[in-house]
Amino acid sequence: MLKWIAFAPAMLALVAAGAWAQQPPTVRVAGTVESFDGRVLAIKSVKLGEVKVNLTGDAAVFGVSKATIADVKPGAYIGVGAMPQSDGSQRALQVTLFAEVQRGVGEGFRPWDARPNSTMTNGAVEQTVAGVDGQVVMVKYKGGEQKVVIPPDAVILSYAVGDKSELKPGAHVAIIRALKKPDGSLEANRVNVGRGEVVPQ
């Protein structure tokens, strides 16, 4: 079965370098749910083995689903992982449509860590028109904007507010930043869960 891989690095808000140095270490955890008792989420991870993460009482769950270019509409808040083109535009590798409650997350234009020279643009869709090589989208953010070409082979994903009831055994989940506490335990306030064939990373 075809699986859609959802990458999330650099889609979240950046933290100032000085403040980051003072923060406790974090761990990225991705895998399948083994169990969830309402507080402790047990995950089987290929990279980390069996991991248990304590979820905070207000932990948010976001469902990640496959979307289409038709969902990329003016006003939508998106994140675009792309490669720069010779004409100054960005050719999208992956587009993420954020839930409305996530509007403003990671806003701006910066390097992406998915592959060498790749970029990340988070902002609001200002306009979208059909182009020769794909849909041409203007993404506006505070202080600037980027012209993005979304080719037919770009991965397009959508985030929606989910519920802890989705954290069932076998569900594919990803925690981008699980806080590693002094006693070695992990704690998180957000979980991404794949819907359909999407596998969050």
Model-predicted segments: where are they?
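Short, flexible, surface-exposed loop segments at domain boundaries
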Residues: 4, 17-201
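Bacterial N-terminal signal peptides
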Residues: 6-16
